[in-house]
Amino acid sequence: MASTTPITMEDLQKALETQSRALRAELAAGASQSRRPRPPRQRDSSTTGDDSGRDSGGPRRRRGNRGRGQRRDWSRAPPPPEERQETRSQTPAPKPSRAPPQQPQPPRMQTGRGGSAPRPELGPPTNPFQAAVARGLRPPLHDPDTEAPTEACVTSWLWSEGEGAVFYRVDLHFTNLGTPPLDEDGRWDPALMYNPCGPEPPAHVVRAYNQPAGDVRGVWGKGERTYAEQDFRVGGTRWHRLLRMPVRGLDGDSAPLPPHTTERIETRSARHPWRIRFGAPQAFLAGLLLAAVAVGTARAGLQPRADMAAPPTLPQPPRAHGQHYGHHHHQLPFLGHDGHHGGTLRVGQHHRNASDVLPGHWLQGGWGCYNLSDWHQGTHVCHTKHMDFWCVEHDRPPPATPTPLTTAANSTTAATPATAPAPCHAGLNDSCGGFLSGCGPMRLRHGADTRCGRLICGLSTTAQYPPTRFGCAMRWGLPPWELVVLTARPEDGWTCRGVPAHPGTRCPELVSPMGRATCSPASALWLATANALSLDHALAAFVLLVPWVLIFMVCRRTCRRRGAAAALTAVVLQGYNPPAYGEEAFTYLCTAPGCATQAPVPVRLAGVRFESKIVDGGCFAPWDLEATGACICEIPTDVSCEGLGAWVPTAPCARIWNGTQRACTFWAVNAYSSGGYAQLASYFNPGGSYYKQYHPTACEVEPAFGHSDAACWGFPTDTVMSVFALASYVQHPHKTVRVKFHTETRTVWQLSVAGVSCNVTTEHPFCNTPHGQLEVQVPPDPGDLVEYIMNHTGNQQSRWGLGSPNCHGPDWASPVCQRHSPDCSRLVGATPERPRLRLVDADDPLLRTAPGPGEVWVTPVIGSQARKCGLHIRAGPYGHATVEMPEWIHAHTTSDPWHPPGPLGLKFKTVRPVALPRTLAPPRNVRVTGCYQCGTPALVEGLAPGGGNCHLTVNGEDLGAFPPGKFVTAALLNTPPPYQVSCGGESDRASARVIDPAAQSFTGVVYGTHTTAVSETRQTWAEWAAAHWWQLTLGAICALLLAGLLACCAKCLYYLRGAIAPR
């Protein structure tokens, strides 16, 4: 197709003016050449338009271009002036008694003769189409002898996201120019279709309607009407446009569709002339599927119903006991259901949850309720074939004759033995009597150890019947009408037609003092209706109605704004499988980066980081205790930095001398060994007053009697040695402390779950992976933190303080409560106290300890040459009242901002596959270590094949799902070797090192309170559907009925959404 120039509204009007003038001239010329009187013709009563200008003998009947509500034919040009004058009546009209009201004059329209003239032949507009013609938009040009389109005005729609769910209705008339042309860039010009015959829309709507757009979002079909939907932007606002498209053009060819950007639509197909996308049926289909899921998953009371409580689940058949416990079988407790944790255990006078008292692996196997007496003291548990027995140690002798078993009326216990345990002995051949519950000699763990064990005497337990459980039986595929008693507790009093019910009894209805139980849907419905006034049933009814209300809201929202229909249809068409969890495991993970565990997929802690809002608290310079000194093998005459310049470094001495609160001390060692006792002794009077008279000094002078002068070696013993020490608090030029406040601190734990990285916090402790959902029990966030960044000659060290400081309390003098300067030049805190100097001998035991706060110890050191000695200085903590020193920071802070109190708890839920898994190769290098039928899990390890998760089975027992690679698990084994292992397909033999169950019948392990992982029973969708087929059938019927009602409502809203709130 050749490209053409886009046609504007001005070009369209000029073309219409030109064609109108040509048609007028042609009709006028034909009328003047052949003007003859026409024979009268009887008026057809069915026609209401003007019959002038029609040949009565013509084979065709003219049909006008009538729109909605039109009374005249506007499809052709008006008659010429000459013909108008002849057709008018020559009889003058009677004058009215009063002046008629002035009629509104039509606007002056442009003609083709360079001027403007009124259109008196039209008169005032009486309908929207006449109003469009009065505004200058000419009617379509048709041959009077050809049929015109029957539908003149159609309705299109516009709506904008910026204005909410407000629809603009645009009534327009198709300009009869045949096939709409295309622009040069291949886009369709919608301005050619804009010829309004209704109320004038707002200006911004007109601009949006005339905005060219080449992308088509969808095509809608309704009978012979076709709409194309487009979305585009006008001035930053996103608009949606629904355009009515002509079915066939005047040239006889189908009108071409606008170019589609996402798919190709074939218009010449015999079966599907139009492709409908994102229509209402898709939205209704989505609602239908959601309704089916909501009804199917709701337990609508179609199981065996009792008006008192929900029926319990089917119990596991009891396991067989060993032959050596056959005579105690009547005293053993009844077995319960796998994974059932609702039992209670009576210990003394208190009832406790069985999962808190019994060993951890009891939660994985069958168990019953035990009733212990008050005086029992033992906590041992004996195991045999997954059966556990509480055994006691007691010195109480048994009675001479055992008390017979009695049955109490209306009690939950069947038999209570009133016996006491026998005394325990050390011999293996001793026994405790026939009334014991299977307890025997306690063996050692190692099978090769032949040492004697000790006898653990058990107490016969109280047998308790399992709770009553029902099931429904079908007859020849009909609905379940009969009730089957699976387990019966005599105390419940269930009867069938007056006969007590026993396991295996089939009955339409059971009666007991607690109520009635039946499987009939009618009876179940009656029970539900009778109990509808209760809170539980009202809440259940509300929960069942919520999905329908949501579906209605979604459908209504979809019909009002089509943006949701596309998303909802995409979800339905692409498919969505809600996550269904098959297994649940719980384990712990340490908090050190790099820790890893198996739960059951590998989980590793990659790192821990903190996120917080940081506020700068400024910087300060801490006080620094600095000391210097010298060891001199004589008594100097000037004890100062200038007089001791040969022995003391000048720069540190001057910095310390000019510091704050300095301490300066001069010691003379062995002053009396140099002759002139009285003279030299007078030098060292208290306070050193005599020495200062002869020797200028600013330090305290003290004698050091008893100190060794061996530092100045190689001279007679009368050598005099002196020690000088100087210390003070100074501002160190290379020490600074910067303070930062951390608020809204949040700990982010970076985990790697089977190679998938995710971050968990206290706000979002979940991690969704392709293998399942991981829930992490993270410790609470540390809260507000204060960070001290200590810089010492370029080396930075951060210390963390927990919580905000109490500046009005004990932390008033802390660094965070002081005003700091950005350049770290301000000293913080009050002036410290004077340091204390002390002369310590080299062999003094005091040197084995550390100097006290504010103390400086000086020790003479023997030099490498004669008359050369050194000085060793040790400074203690700062030790003053102010707390802004680094010692305070170290004492009140920590290097790690947060130490979790314990490991992270990981709860992993594996995803249950909807489809059956593929057949995998058998696992390799599988080893089984441990024992079987002994109550202790055995270790199973090996390599799972690739291609998906391996559902490991050992001799037909499912041990769980494992990803490809190495796996290690523990399982209770019921069968002896050899062991056949598989992943659901081919099997292979595993190597086993197991202990004989006879040698490990009694492990003698002392248990406390344990928590362990609980594995739920896995069930496929097919199994679930087979077990609930009747519920699914009723749910589907209800869903179809309700979906039909919703479809009717949504359909009405969809087709009338613009008419409800037009603009």
Swiss-Prot record:
Q: Where is this site: Cleavage?
A: A300, G301, G582, E583
Region annotation (Functions as E2 signal peptide) ranges: 279-300
Kindly report every residue range on the membrane side named Cytoplasmic. Answer: 556-582
List of residues that carry Phosphoserine: S46
Q: Which residues cross the membrane?
A: 535-555, 1029-1049
Q: Which domain of life is it from?
A: Viruses
What Pfam families does the record tag this protein with?
Rubella_Capsid (PF05750), Rubella_E1 (PF05748), Rubella_E2 (PF05749)
Q: Where is the composition biased (Pro residues)?
A: 93-107
Which loops or segments lie on the Extracellular side of the membrane, by the record? 301-534, 583-1028, 1050-1063
What keywords sit in the KW lines? Calcium, Capsid protein, Clathrin-mediated endocytosis of virus by host, Disulfide bond, Fusion of virus membrane with host endosomal membrane, Fusion of virus membrane with host membrane, Glycoprotein, Host cytoplasm, Host Golgi apparatus, Host membrane, Host mitochondrion, Host-virus interaction, Lipoprotein, Membrane, Metal-binding, Palmitate, Phosphoprotein, RNA-binding, T=4 icosahedral capsid protein, Transmembrane, Transmembrane helix, Viral attachment to host cell, Viral envelope protein, Viral penetration into host cytoplasm, Virion, Virus endocytosis by host, Virus entry into host cell
Residues that coordinate or bind Ca(2+): N670, A671, D718, T719
Region Functions as E1 signal peptide, residue ranges? 563-582
**Ranges of Basic and acidic residues compositional bias?**
70-87
InterPro entries given in the database record: Rubella_Capsid, Rubella_Capsid_sf, Rubella_E1, Rubella_E1_1, Rubella_E1_2, Rubella_E1_3, Rubella_E2
State the domain notes. Answer: Structural polyprotein: Contains two internal signal peptides that are necessary for directing translocation of the glycoproteins into the lumen of the endoplasmic reticulum.
Any extra remark in the record?
Answer: Structural polyprotein: Translated from a subgenomic RNA synthesized during togaviruses replication.
Please identify the protein, giving its name as recorded. Structural polyprotein
Provenance organism: Rubella virus (strain RA27/3 vaccine)
At the highest ranks, the source species' classification is:
Viruses, Riboviria, Orthornavirae, Kitrinoviricota, Alsuviricetes
